[in-house]
């Protein structure tokens, strides 16, 4: 399991990709999972291309992980819940630009499209949704891109009100487990990438050998079973009745001590990054073998 210590740009996908690539080069059959993903249409143009080419709403991370691993699992199963964000038009907030900043920082307030895929025995059921009235509150250039995606994805998006967005995301979050269960046993090794700084991308997480917590320039490695126990403590103590979303990584890690702390070299330093990847893979394999012993 690869998790982030910060909300954005922790480097989860970079580390996950490096680990997957090294495992594949050593002959492992690697499966990948990005159960929940969010991407911004304005800042991540590759997500627009991916969505149009694959005819489903999908970001960069899931596509990169699938390509790196060589997995034949469908993108919908690798990434069953995808949320597309779009910048809002500041013209609607001129009397309260602080509200504009708050809305731009909120996933719920800036989400424009959503895909939920549910894996069943006979295949995958997919639905797309679009917060239709929010189209009027985003800049025209972004609106055209959103409308283009909506025309290219299948099934066509269902129009929803903003109030329906959060319940749908929570529904998709819980349902994403169906796809993970469907693909997990097909592979020798599973590499799971969480979203933002969430402690877990699944409502029920089991059988994790190792956890890699990523921050810019540094990673911390934890025993998977110990991590899961700490996650359960956080959930049991605070209780879901007081919590709308899943715990953050920091809430869990404050209860633990890492097995290893490794400096991450600058990615452009090819030799050092290659050594880092080999070292990381060795440690993860060793921890996994101990967990299964």
Regions found by a protein language model. Name each.
Residues 15:
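Hydrophobic positions on the alpha1 helix immediately C-terminal to the Walker A/P-loop
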Residues 1-2, 9-10, 18-293:
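Flexible phosphate-sensing "switch/lid" loops adjacent to ATP/NTP-binding sites
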């Amino acid at each position: 399991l690869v998790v982030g210590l910060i909300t954005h740009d922790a480097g989860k996908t970079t580390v996950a990709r490096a680990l997957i690539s090294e495992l594949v080069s050593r002959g492992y059959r690697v499966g990948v999972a990005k159960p929940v993903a969010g991407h911004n249409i304005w800042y991540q143009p590759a997500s627009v291309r991916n969505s149009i080419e694959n005819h489903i709403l999908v970001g960069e991370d899931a596509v990169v992980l699938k390509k790196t691993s060589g997995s034949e699992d469908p993108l919908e199963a690798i990434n069953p819940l995808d949320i597309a964000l779009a910048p809002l038009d500041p013209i609607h907030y001129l009397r309260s630009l602080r509200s504009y900043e708050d809305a731009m920082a909120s996933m719920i307030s800036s989400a424009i499209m959503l895909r939920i895929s549910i894996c069943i025995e006979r295949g995958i059921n997919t639905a797309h949704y679009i917060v239709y009235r929010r189209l009027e509150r985003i800049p025209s250039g972004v609106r055209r891109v959103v409308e283009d995606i909506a025309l290219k994805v299948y099934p066509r998006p269902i129009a929803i009100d903003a109030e329906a967005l959060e319940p749908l995301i929570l529904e998709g979050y819980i349902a994403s487990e169906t796809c993970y269960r469907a693909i997990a046993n097909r592979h020798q090794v599973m590499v799971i990438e969480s979203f933002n700084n969430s402690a877990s991308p699944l409502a029920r997480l089991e059988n994790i050998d190792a956890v890699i917590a990523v921050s810019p320039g540094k990673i911390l490695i934890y025993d998977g079973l110990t991590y899961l126990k700490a996650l359960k403590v956080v959930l049991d103590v605070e209780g879901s009745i007081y919590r709308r979303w899943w715990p953050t990584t920091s809430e869990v890690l404050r209860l633990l001590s890492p097995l290893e702390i490794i400096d991450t070299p600058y990615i452009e330093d090819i030799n050092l990054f290659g050594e880092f990847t080999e070292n990381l893979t060795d440690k993860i394999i060793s921890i996994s073998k101990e967990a299964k012993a």
